[in-house]
Structure formats: C-alpha cells, structure tokens
C-alpha cells in the first residue's frame, strides 16, 4: 500500500502512540481525519508483515464514501481491505460466514469504525463482531468520543479489543462495579469512572477539533413560524388526548405522545383513537403548510449549496418535489435509506456538481459523508437524538472547510419544537426530561401541560368545558 496524502500533526501523534500496541482506540472528533490514521497503521502492519488482510466494519450508509476516501489517500482500490456494514452483521448469515472464514484463514486487522454502533452487548451485531475479534491479533476502534451516553458504552467496545484492558469477562461484572440503577432499571449514575479512564488511557488517542484544526466557526439561527389556527387547535387536541395517559414507567406512552405531536407539527392529521397512531396529510396542497412556506422563504435568493435535514420521508418527498417544480429538475436530490446505494451515490455526485440542495434524513446522511464543499445546513425538522444531530452538523464542519458554517433550525412557536431544541442545546435526552417532568408534576396539570405548549392549561380546560356544553347549560352558567 502506498499513501499519497500527507498527515496533519495531530494525525502523526495518533499514529506514533497507536503503532506501538496491537489494539487501540482512536477517539477523534468528526472531521479530524481518523480514516487517514487508520490507513497509516494498516500500512505499518503490512510493511512489517504482521497482517495480510483488513476487515473494516462501518455503518452501511458510509461504505461507498469510505471506499472513495481510501482511494483518495492511496490512489487506487485496495484488494487487501474488505469493507462490511456493521448493520449487515445483525442478520446476514452469508456476510458473517464470509468474514469468519477470512479471520480463520488470514492474519486480519479488524477495524470497527463508528464503534458506538456496537455499544449494546446484547445485540447480534456486537456478538458477531466479538466472535470475529477472537481470531484477530490486531484490532482498532474508531469513534468521535469514548462515550456518547454514559460509561456503560465502553464495555462492549473494549471487550472487542481485549477484555483484559477493563478487566471484566462479562457485562454483569462490569455493571456491578461501575453502574448504579434506579428502581426502574435505568442507569442512575456511573461509579469508579477514574478507574476506567486509567485503564483505557494507555491504549487510546483522543483529540477534539478545536485542539487541532483551525476551522471557521459555526453560527446558529432559529427561524420561528406559527401553525395555522386550525392546525394549532388540532395540536392542542392531540395533546389533550395523550398528555394524561403518560406513564413514566412506560416509555411507549411518552414516545407515542412525542411522535403524535411531531406529526401534527410536520403537517399531518393525527388520529389517536387507536393504539397505533394513524396519519394523513393535513393540507391538500403541501404549499399550504406553513412549515414548508417558511422553508421556501429561506431558500428564496439563497445561492449556497445547502443540506436540508428532515425527520420524515414524506417531508423529504414533498420538499424535493416542490423545489424541483419551482427551480428545475435535480435542483434538489434526496438522500435516504429507501434509495439503493447506487442511487444515493449518484445523488451525492449530483449534489457535488450541479444540484444545489441535498434533502436527507439524519439516520442516513449523518454518518461518514464528507460534504465540506457545502457550508449551509437547514434542519427542517429535528428528532431528540443529540448524537445524530452532532454527526449531521459535522458532515460539513471538518477538515477542508474554509467557510463559516451556518446552521438554521426551523421551529414552530409554542410547540414541542421549542422543547426539542432546548434539549439539543443542553445535550439532554428528551424522553428522560419528560419522565422527570411527569415525576415532578404528577398533580400539577398546568405545569405538565406547559411543557409542550405555552398555552395556559387552566384557561384551556375552561374553554373546553364551555365548548362542550350545549346552549341551555351555557345560559344557566351565565
């Protein structure tokens, strides 16, 4: 293997530390070039005849991008590197058998890219990767940070490398020493964290962007709009129906309410009369949706290439169709998991050349893409996952970015949208926040209600009471 790109100083430091050990972790924030570090380590092992093949596991959505990155750094495809999607190992017998045969018959270097995807010790993908790792002497995990939620994330990732680093052969022994649970089975806090830091320190290299890159800043803007009167009334009705069925012991009731309210905000008519929420378009013409109107006003006169992140497939379809109808075919191209890998790559190529807008969902577009030629992001709709939000932002805020990155959030005033953005700003989990509110305000209807709307619950309840009375009863009250 011949590497044709130069390394930055922070990448050289990473290689200098990790080349001396057989297993290791490169915790390098998105955009700092961890792929280049991994390729340098591979090259060193190959030259010293310690390995003869590489199994590189990564999210399925970034396989093609990883191939192109490897070609960018080496000048050609590398037959000694087998790339496989992490998610594939959850279900594909063929892929698992093929990789198992490889590790049994070759000296394989196992690389787990975006290793936070294997933090669940019970998951099939994690168990299958652990089985592969048993046959590999050289192993490397790549991720932005050691922990995305809490220190429990560390166990499986480091068990894949070598259980002896942390010193626990099972998750239960790890949990007994480091995790404290509440009476609902939820991790309350992590214990003896200093021990874990001390154990992984000799095998880890960690760097943040601000420590190593002179990148231009990110600027943020929130653009507010209001639901139509009828739409907001529907929002409040759905809140009325679902608010007091909430149960902090049953996360399903919380997710059900969040999903239903976000559906309404998105522009859907929501029926909550059955267990499964049923939706249909609220507006006959998508252009009547005030959220889409707000987006189109933002795009009017915008010349920069722009990524538009959406939560729902229906939003992506509507936005792509509306933009292309107004500005011409392929002005906007979609990027979702529903498309084939070939079609996704074709749309990325169009976005890099002639198309102005990439309309994507975060689950597909947040991982592994290098889009630093773009400097404008619009979050048309958000979910409550800070991890994928951060990943999405850093698709453009990375090595090679020379422009200020401007990020816009579209927000429906006085709705759950505002709460979601507050939780993202604070890096909080929305479901956990709601659980806390339920626990604190069990007997305070108005407090709990104000969590998802700024309307006064007491006035709302009185107006509903009046609304539901017939005229004779109303006259009696008056």
PLM feature segments, named:
Residues 1-27:
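Conserved pre-motif I regulatory segment
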Residues 22-25, 29, 115, 122, ...:
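Interdomain linker/hinge connecting the two RecA-like lobes of the SF2 helicase core
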Residues 35-40, 50-70, 148-153, 311-313:
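Conserved Walker A/P-loop ATP-binding site and its immediately adjacent core
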Residues 52-53, 72, 109, 126-211, ...:
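Conserved P-loop NTPase motor "coupling/switch" region that bridges the ATPase
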Residues 61-81, 161-164, 326:
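Conserved helix-turn-beta segment of the N-terminal RecA-like "Helicase ATP-binding" lobe
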Residues 79-93, 350-367:
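Conserved two-lobed SF2 helicase motor
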Residues 137-171, 212-239, 360-443:
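SF2 helicase/translocase ATPase core recognition
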Residues 307-309, 317-320, 324-365:
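Conserved helicase ATPase core of P-loop NTP-dependent helicases/translocases
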């Amino acid at each position: 293997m011949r590497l044709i790109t130069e390394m930055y100083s922070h990448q050289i430091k990473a290689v200098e530390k990790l080349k001396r050990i057989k297993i290791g972790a490169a915790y390098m924030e998105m955009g700092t070039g961890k792929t280049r570090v991994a390729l340098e380590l591979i090259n060193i092992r190959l030259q010293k005849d310690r390995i003869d093949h590489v199994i590189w596991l990564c999210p399925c959505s970034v396989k093609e991008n990883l191939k192109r990155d490897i070609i960018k750094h080496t000048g050609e495809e590398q037959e000694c590197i087998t790339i496989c999607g992490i998610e594939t190992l959850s279900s594909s017998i063929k892929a698992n058998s093929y990789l198992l045969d490889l590790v049994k018959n070759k000296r394989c270097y196992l690389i787990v890219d975006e290793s936070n995807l294997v933090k669940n010790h019970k998951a099939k993908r994690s168990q299958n990767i652990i089985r592969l790792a048993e046959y590999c002497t050289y192993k490397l995990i790549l991720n932005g940070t050691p922990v995305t939620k809490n220190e429990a994330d560390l166990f499986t990732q480091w068990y894949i490398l070598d259980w002896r680093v942390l010193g626990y052969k099972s998750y239960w022994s790890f949990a007994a020493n480091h995790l404290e649970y509440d009476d609902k089975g939820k991790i309350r806090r992590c214990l003896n964290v200093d021990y874990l830091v001390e154990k992984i320190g000799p095998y880890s290299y960690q760097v943040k962007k601000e420590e190593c890159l002179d990148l231009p800043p990110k600027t943020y803007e929130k653009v507010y709009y209001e639901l139509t009167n009828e739409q907001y009334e529907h929002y409040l009705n759905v809140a009325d129906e679902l608010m007091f069925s909430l149960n902090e012991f049953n996360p399903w009731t919380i997710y059900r309410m969040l999903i239903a309210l976000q559906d309404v905000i998105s522009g859907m008519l929501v029926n909550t009369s059955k267990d499964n929420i049923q939706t249909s378009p609220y507006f006959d013409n998508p252009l009547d949706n005030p959220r889409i109107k707000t987006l189109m006003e933002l795009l009017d006169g915008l010349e920069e290439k722009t990524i538009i992140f959406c939560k729902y497939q229906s939003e992506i379809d509507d936005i792509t169709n509306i933009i292309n109808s107004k500005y011409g075919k392929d002005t906007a191209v979609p990027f979702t998991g529903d498309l084939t890998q070939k079609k996704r790559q074709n749309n990325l190529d169009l976005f890099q050349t002639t198309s102005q807008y990439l309309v994507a969902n975060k689950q597909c577009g947040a991982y592994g893409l290098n889009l630093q030629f773009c400097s404008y992001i619009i979050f048309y709709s958000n979910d409550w996952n800070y991890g994928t939000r951060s990943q999405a932002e850093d698709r453009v805020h990375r090595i090679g970015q020379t422009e200020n990155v401007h990020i816009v959030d579209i927000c429906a005033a006085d709705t759950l949208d505002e709460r979601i953005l507050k939780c993202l700003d604070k890096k909080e989990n929305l479901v956990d926040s709601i659980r806390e509110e339920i626990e604190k305000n069990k007997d305070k209807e108005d407090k709990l209600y104000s969590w998802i709307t700024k309307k006064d619950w007491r006035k709302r309840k009185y107006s509903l009471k009046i609304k539901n009375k017939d005229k004779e009863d109303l006259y009696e009250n008056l």
